[in-house]
Amino acid sequence: METYSVWNRIYDYINPIAFKIFDISVHWYGIMYVSAMLIALLIAKAFITYRNERFPITQELLDSFFIWVEIGVILGGRIGYVLIYSPNRWEYLMQPWQMFNPYTNGVFVGISGFSYHGAMAGFVLAAIIFCYVKKQSFWIFMDLSAISIPLGYVFGRIGNFFNHELFGRVIESDSSLRDIGILVNGELRYPSQLFEAFAEGIIVFILLICLLRYAKKPGTLLVAYGVFYALARFVCEYFREADSQMGYFVFGLSMGQILSLVMLVISIFLGLFVFVQKPISSQKIKHQRKKK
């Protein structure tokens, strides 16, 4: 009979609910999501303070931008999940307000289901509108976002881990990796949430930091983020269980992998456009500052 370590049984010691306020449960995922936003904002503030020649953005503009894109993330993430993953998408489309209704039969159950790729689409759309309205450089704001998001993303995936969701695939009985497995319903599964936190968050951030000094053209960091994230997500999906309502598609690919390939192709084509852009010059920076 197989014995399990404390790590294998870690879910026995982690309650998805951090605490309750009256009858409302506050989940770890919610706490981690807020932490992710704050970390990303703090990193962005650090870059516009210490690398202002690369990111000529004021604190006031950054705060305003953050509010705009956060609305885009919430709307895009939820709508994206409903359209791509939810088996009840047609019911939601008939009553779209139900996408954001945290109550079921008068009981608070929260809002379940959030798509990263949908959130990214909402983020970009909100950024485009913001930069158009405020007459700002879309590429500079997106470069700043690209290098600020990854470490915040780490907290989001840890939140998934604490919330007992987005489980990894079952580890084969003869695999030497069973020691790192997490026991879920009697089966050892890969801690794919932590794999994603490391690969899509920490590794991507390190790569972008290494690229920063060479990224002279606006949009370079955005393109690099798209490529790095898409590749990391594609690989990590091999350790992550596909959504039960979706399953696997052509060549055994998950929906996450298909969307990552789409993201990779878009990033490459975007890179061709960025390649012909002029480097950020001191004259352009001065012009940006005068407009503020």
Swiss-Prot record:
Q: Which PROSITE patterns match?
A: LGT
Establish whether keyword Transport is in the entry: no
Q: Which UniProt keywords apply?
A: Cell inner membrane, Cell membrane, Membrane, Transferase, Transmembrane, Transmembrane helix
UniProt family annotation? Belongs to the Lgt family.
**Binding of a 1,2-diacyl-sn-glycero-3-phospho-(1'-sn-glycerol), residues:** R157
Q: What is the name attached to this protein's record?
A: Phosphatidylglycerol--prolipoprotein diacylglyceryl transferase
Q: List the HAMAP family.
A: Lgt
- Record membrane topology: Multi-pass membrane protein
The transmembrane segments are 24-44, 65-85, 110-130, 136-156, 192-212, 219-239, 256-276
Role noted for this protein:
Catalyzes the transfer of the diacylglyceryl group from phosphatidylglycerol to the sulfhydryl group of the N-terminal cysteine of a prolipoprotein, the first step in the formation of mature lipoproteins.
